[in-house]
Structure formats: structure tokens, C-alpha cells
């Protein structure tokens, strides 16, 4: 082991002293540690003499706090006093003094031998003269001062509330203005806010400005409670657009006197109920815009009524346009505008009642004016190139597919609002007249039955209805009469089942006569179909009988059928006016009243049928014609 070289081990002791300063050369200056007496004095100064003996938890918490304080601040620098126990002595002396004073006070209160405590008695002051008056004056001054303070406070509170309400109204006005801008076009002109009610942006050419003004609602009293329907925003609408308006379209049979024109019975249409939550200005603006649109439509119709050249001129008087689509029939278009004043409401309330107003045509007028606006916008010509191909103009325009003058003029013809609405009115009137004619025949004539099936898909100028003529209980075998009526503007096209087309005019009598003749033919056709089912043979059939009574409406139809064995024959004649006449032919052997002659000697001539005998059709039992005919055929058919 002696041969191993020694190893130097450096041992550094732990820093037991607090470093006070580190020099620039790296030297450290340490704080001298406290002596035992100084450490004891430091601990004695930390004693809290106001602490009770039972507070051990608080003492432990205080010791923990001291430990944390020592860790944060480091070693407390002790400032030695003249005597280490000086603070302890001072605390003990003050405590002893307090205890002695407390002991003396308790002895004095408990034992009366040391001191007796009596209440101090004061002599009553002599009453001063007018003491009550002074008291009242002082109370009055006090109440006046208090009232003045309360009044000043109330005034300040009212000013604060008014300012808050004004700020709230200003905020509500801005929010309502924002809602208004979302629905209507607004612009600011100076210190005014103006809106636009017209349809110029949609293509309208009506010269009315249609401007309304947005104002702030200041009619409310700030001292009173704000109503529930209060709106901080209000609109000022021109006087000629106030109230409600509509276009009354009616069809009348008799034309009034010329002195009664322009005095149409106007009834005030109630405004539509606003949706819950809709502001009142929205309802007013919509009503004003509707008034403006109605005035534009009526102005356009009046202009066209004056310009159009027709066989029967149109009449424009005041707020009414009268046209004559059919002879003895007039179409009246009136502008009904009622303001919101009380006088007009009273006068119009007496005239309200059932009117012959055609709401369909009013709706169509609004649609037509919107289509006119759309065409106005679509007719805007886009910029064209400034150059063109060289050559003569006649060579450029001519060609094999060039249009002549008539074709160009026909292509440039456009129907106006008045012409379109007159055509629609004609179609509506013709459709109503057709329905009324069919219903009257169905209610008046029970046999055969007539049924009408109206199509749900129609056009404004054309409608269709399918007419079936049947017999009750025999719908499967008696369905040969099926008519398709195409109702147009001036005429009715009838399409038969076999494809034949008949054109009828607008006259009601023509349609009625045609349906009566078809119902008459149905009875004969029903006998033909029944004969096939019963096994009878058809000898003759015609829809136009040339013999017998001449019918004023249509022609009579007839059919003759024989029994399966040929013994009996039935002849049926049916006319629209003369009615039904049924004849039966019996064999000669069953005719006893035949005169005997020498001409027919052989027995074979006895098998010929004798003369016809008319059947008393009214006394036959059965619910309809076909049922009676079935019973008759069954009775004449051999077993």
C-alpha cells in the first residue's frame, strides 16, 4: 500500500454563515452569527402576551408563518438593545397595570364601602314663553329643508329618467329605421329621410313619384306610461295614397243609363289583418303601394280604352270603364278608393253588401301589369357594334326567308291590358253560361241523366268540360253519348266520341238545343244497345227522320227492332220537343179487328204482322225509358 501514490481529496464545509456581500474579486463577506444571549433575546421578543393559553392551533400557525418569513427574508438582523429583556419587561408592566385597574373597578362596583355612584340630577329649566310656536317654526323649517332636498332629488331623477328614455327612443328609432331599410328603398335628402313606393325599379312607367317621408314619433308624453303599441318611427304618406283601394270588375246584363255612369256602388273593402309582430308602418306602406298600383292599372286601362278602335267604343267616365264584350252584356272596371276619414267610412258602411265582383279578374289585372313591367325591363336594347357589313341595304335585308310588310306588322302587334282582360271576361262569362245551361237541363230533365266533369287544368282563355248522357242503371250499355266541350273566348267547340267537331257560338240557346237533340238521340241509341243485349234485331235506325212532325229544335230519331222469332216489332220515335212515341206491331193472327177480305185466301199470309198500335207510355211501369223498354221487350219475347 505504501507504493500507491497519495490522492488529494478536497473537502468543503457547508455554508453555516449567511453571505452578506460578494466583492469584485470574488471574496465573500459573511454575517457574524448571533450569540446565545442575542438569539434568546430575539426569541423573547416574538412572544405574544395577548394570546390566550388555549390557542395551540393559532400558535402552530404562527410558528409556521415565522418559519416561512425566515425562509423568505433570510436571517433577521438583530438590533441589540440596552438590555435583552427590555421588551419583555415593558409588556409585563403594562399587563400588570391593566389587571390592577380592572381589579379596582370590580371592587368599587361590587362593594359599596369604597365609593357610591349616584345618577346626576339636573334641575328642570323654566318654561320659556311661546315655546310651542318656536317648536312649530323649527319643525316647519326642518320639513321645508327636507322637502327641498326631496324635490331636488326627484328633479334629478326625472331628468335622468327622461335622458334614459330619450336615449332608448333614439336607439329604438335607429333599430326601426334599420328594419324599414330591409323592406323599402330609402335615401337621405338633406335632413330628411325619403322612401320610394313606386314600381319604377320593376319596370313601371307611371309618372307618380310615390315618395314617403320617415319621421320620428314625438307625440308621446314622457310623463305618462309608454303604450304597448308605441313605435318610435312614423311615415308620412301622400294624401292621394292614403286609405285602401281595389279594382272592381263586374259583368252585368243590362247597361245603365248614361247619367248613372261613374256612380258605381262602391263598398269599402276591409284591410287585411296584419300578422302579429308586424309594425304599423309596414301595413300603411303596403296599403299605399297597393293604391298606387291600382291607380297605375286604371290609368293604363283608360289610356288603352281611348286609343283602341273597336266596333262598339269603350266608355271612360270618372273612375269607371265600360265595355261591351257581347250584345246585351257589359263589362265594368271601376277604381274604388276609400280614405280613412270618418265621413267616408260612414257612407261606405251603408253600401256594403253582396256584390258581383269578380276577384279572379282583379287578380289577373295585377298579374298582367306585372308582366307589362317585366316586358318593359326586357325591352332594354343592349349596346350594338358600330360596324356593319358592306353592301346595299336592300341586298342585306332581302332573302328567301325575309318577312313581308304584313308579317312584320302582325309580329309587332301586342295586345294591351284592356284587350286581354276583355277576352278573359268573355271566357269567364261563356264558361258560367255553359255551366248554368248544363245544370238547368240536369235539374229539369231526369231521364236521361246528364253529367258534367270539369277539368281542373284550364287556361285563362280556354276551359274544357266532359259531358256524359246516361240512363240510371244502364251506364255500362248506354254510354255512346260522350261530348267534349272546349269553351273558348267567342265560341264553343264540341268534339264527339267519333271525332266529329261542331262549333257553337256564344248564344245560350244554341248550346241548349244541341244538348236536347243529343239527349233525344241517346234514347234511340239506348234502344239499339238494349236490343243487342236482349237478342232483338234492328231493322232500321236513323237520327234524322224525314216524316212526321217537324221539330223546331233539331231532328227526331227513330229505330225499329223485331223480336228474335220475328213475330213482334217495336218502332220508337223520339224528338227533342215531341217526346217519345212507341208503336208495337203484332202478328195478323192475333188481330181480331182486322177486316176480312177475299184478297188473302191462303193461310201463309196469316203470318204477316198486322198494323202498329201505340203504347200508352205514360202508364208503363219503370223508373226510366230504358227500363220500360226492357220490360216491353221481355214481355214480347217468346219463352
Swiss-Prot record:
GO CC annotations on file: mediator complex
Show the GO MF annotations. transcription coregulator activity
Where in the cell is the protein located? Nucleus
User: Which function does this protein serve?
Assistant: Component of the Mediator complex, a coactivator involved in the regulated transcription of nearly all RNA polymerase II-dependent genes. Mediator functions as a bridge to convey information from gene-specific regulatory proteins to the basal RNA polymerase II transcription machinery. Mediator is recruited to promoters by direct interactions with regulatory proteins and serves as a scaffold for the assembly of a functional preinitiation complex with RNA polymerase II and the general transcription factors.
Instruction: Tell me which family the UniProt entry assigns to this protein.
Output: Belongs to the Mediator complex subunit 17 family.
- Does the record's keyword annotation contain Chloroplast? no
Q: What is this protein called?
A: Mediator of RNA polymerase II transcription subunit 17
Which keywords are on file for this protein?
A: Activator, Nucleus, Transcription, Transcription regulation
- Quaternary state and interactors: Component of the Mediator complex.
Q: Please give the organism.
A: Xenopus tropicalis (Western clawed frog)
**What does the record list as GO biological process?**
regulation of transcription by RNA polymerase II
A Pfam family of the record is Med17
